[in-house]
Swiss-Prot record:
Entry's free-text remark on domains: The PRC barrel domain binds ribosomal protein uS19.
Function: An accessory protein needed during the final step in the assembly of 30S ribosomal subunit, possibly for assembly of the head region. Essential for efficient processing of 16S rRNA. May be needed both before and after RbfA during the maturation of 16S rRNA. It has affinity for free ribosomal 30S subunits but not for 70S ribosomes.
Cellular compartment(s): Cytoplasm
Phylogenetic classification of the source organism: Bacteria, Pseudomonadati, Chlorobiota, Chlorobiia, Chlorobiales
One Pfam family it belongs to: PRC_RimM
GO molecular function: ribosome binding
Gene that this sequence comes from: rimM
Protein name, UniProt field: Ribosome maturation factor RimM
Family: Belongs to the RimM family.
Length: 167
């Protein structure tokens, strides 16, 4: 079973187990209709969770799960990721990439010279940030058109011509 990341649990809200979730999807409305997720800190350690109720507000999903009925139980889930099965995903729109397809891609700087590997995609309120591992450590690159010139799924690379500005 292949799992796809769809959200990150940020923190509990209130005393009854409600959870604030940062969607990591182009389709946040699907949080309103989905009844099951797989929750875990890594895809290898997930457990199924059933949704009791869901709302969307201010760019976040607010979820109640069966069996999570207190702030303490909700706090244990903070920092976990929510995954769905690949078969539940909508087809990828043309000229778009799923986030998990980008992880592991080579990152090229000016003149096509390889500078590192994309190791993680960090969800942030304004936009995602790419974590790139280089020979000298880790660099964070905002995932916006100003810095990302090209993403080639077929070639397995991302072009960041101004990479030197982040060193």
């Amino acid at each position: 079973m292949e799992l796809w990341l769809t959200g990150t649990i940020l923190k509990p809200k209130g005393l009854k187990g409600e959870l604030k979730v940062q969607p990591v999807t182009d389709f946040p409305d699907r949080f309103l209709s989905r009844t099951k997720y797989f929750a875990g800190r890594q895809p290898e350690t997930v457990v199924p969770v059933n949704v009791k109720s869901a709302t969307l507000s201010q760019g976040f999903a607010w979820l109640f799960f069966e069996g999570v009925d207190s702030r303490e139980k909700a706090q244990e889930m903070a920092g976990m990721h929510l995954y769905i099965e690949e078969k539940e995903c909508a087809p990828r729109p043309q000229n778009r990439a799923w986030l998990h397809e980008l992880e592991g891609m080579r990152v090229k700087g000016r003149d096509g010279v390889e500078v590192g590997v994309l190791t993680a995609i960090l969800p942030m309120p304004a936009h995602e940030v790419y974590e790139v591992r280089t020979g000298n450590g880790t660099v964070l690159i905002p995932a916006i058109d100003e810095f990302i010139d090209e993403i080639s799924l077929e070639g397995g690379y991302i072009v960041v011509p101004r990479f030197d500005e982040f060193l």
